Structures are given as structure tokens and as C-alpha cells.
Design a protein with these regions (language model features):
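Conserved, mostly hydrophobic/aromatic
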Residues: 8, 27, 104, 163
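Hydrophobic faces of well-ordered beta-strands that scaffold small-molecule active sites
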Residues: 5-7, 35-37, 91-93, 112-114, ...
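Conserved small/polar residues in nucleotide/adenosyl-binding loops
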Residues: 175-181
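Catalytic domains of carbohydrate-active enzymes, especially glycoside hydrolases
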Residues: 22-38
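Active-site mouth loops of central-metabolism enzymes
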Residues: 6-19, 67-69, 90-92
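Glycine-rich, proline-tolerant flexible connector loops at the mouths of alpha/beta enzymes
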Residues: 35-69
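Conserved anion-binding
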Residues: 120-172
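Active-site beta->alpha loop and helix N-cap motifs at the rims of alpha/beta catalytic domains
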Residues: 59-116
Length: 185
């Protein structure tokens, strides 16, 4: 694979399609090849206790209201899909659970992405690998053993993949960079 530049949008759109489109436009203007989002089924990723806990936000007073305010559903992803096609930029998303991966399968994204926090979720890895779609696998929050297990799953299903060694805290200080790890993965 040649150099491929992807702009991480994640949930930085704040649940607002106009902000989302501005971020896609900025990625296009910057010469990016793709934009990436994050998709979660809140009831699969978080506990009821956590979702019910207090959190003041523009969307309400609980974690659930805040998290739900940041999530896009089918109509928004259909709009993202069309907007990216119209602007000749790829898009894909990291699914944080099985339901979200199944949701994303209805779109014709070139790539899958595994978030480093999900590298220990074997059912999710298997579901993604079975698609045999080129997959970017983040390793920033993982042990070498976790990485080896994931690689084994993707090789078993003959799914092409790329290991990425990001740092999972933003911004990262120079002293916390783990660049030598790139040689290991």
C-alpha cells in the first residue's frame, strides 16, 4: 500500500452534520485520502450504571444523553456516505462492538478499522476478519500478546491488514512516544 492519509474525525463532529461536513471538507482540502469515524452501540459498549451516571453536557445531564448526542444513526451515515462520494474521499469507521460492525457492513467502505481498545474483543475481530476487507489495526493500548492474537485471527481468515502503532492519549508528549515499538509490530 502506498502512503494513505486519513483524517480522524471520530466523534469530533459533536453529533452535528454541518460540523461533520466541514471536517470532511477540511480533509479534502488538505489532500487526505479518507476520513474515519467511530461507531458505538451505547448499550453494548457501556454499562447501564455508567450510562445513568451524571454528566452535564449540551445534550443532557447523564452519560447516556452525552454519548447519544455524539452518535450518528443510519440517516446521518447515509448522508456521510453520499457526501464523501460526491467529494471523492473514502470513509470508514472503527466499530466498538458487533452491532456497530454489522451496521457498517451496509455501506461500501473500502476499509475496516480496529480501535486499539477493541483488540481484545475476539468476536469483533473474527467478524471483521471474515469480511476479508483490508483492515487497519491500531495497537496503541495493547500488549504484544494481544497483538499476536489479533494477527492470528486475521491470518486465519486470510484478511489483509496493517498494524498501526498510534499513541492513545492526545496530545502525546515526546517522552511518551513509543516509536521503537514500530520495529516490533
Amino acid at each position: 500500500m502506498s502512503i494513505y492519509i486519513c483524517a480522524e474525525i471520530g466523534i469530533n463532529h459533536n453529533g452535528d452534520m454541518s460540523i461533520c461536513k466541514q471536517l470532511i471538507d477540511a480533509a479534502c482540502e488538505s489532500g487526505c485520502d479518507a476520513v474515519k469515524f467511530q461507531k458505538r452501540d451505547l448499550d453494548q459498549v457501556y454499562t447501564q450504571e455508567f450510562l445513568d451516571s451524571p454528566r452535564e453536557s449540551p445534550w443532557g445531564t447523564t452519560q447516556r444523553e452525552q454519548k447519544a448526542g455524539l452518535e450518528f444513526g443510519l440517516s446521518e451515515y447515509q448522508e456521510i456516505d453520499q457526501y464523501c462520494k460526491d467529494n471523492n474521499i473514502d470513509w470508514y469507521a472503527s466499530a466498538w462492538d458487533l452491532n456497530s460492525q454489522k451496521f457498517l457492513q451496509q455501506f461500501d467502505c473500502k476499509y475496516n478499522k480496529v480501535a486499539s481498545a477493541m483488540l481484545v474483543h475476539n468476536k469483533l475481530l473474527k467478524t471483521i476478519a471474515e469480511e476479508k476487507k483490508y483492515t487497519f489495526i491500531s495497537t496503541g493500548m495493547s500488549t504484544l500478546k494481544d497483538i499476536e492474537k489479533a494477527v492470528k485471527i486475521f491470518r486465519k481468515f486470510k484478511c489483509p491488514f496493517e498494524l498501526m502503532n498510534p499513541h492513545s492519549a492526545y496530545p502525546v508528549s515526546y517522552t511518551h512516544l513509543t516509536l521503537p515499538t514500530i520495529l516490533l509490530v
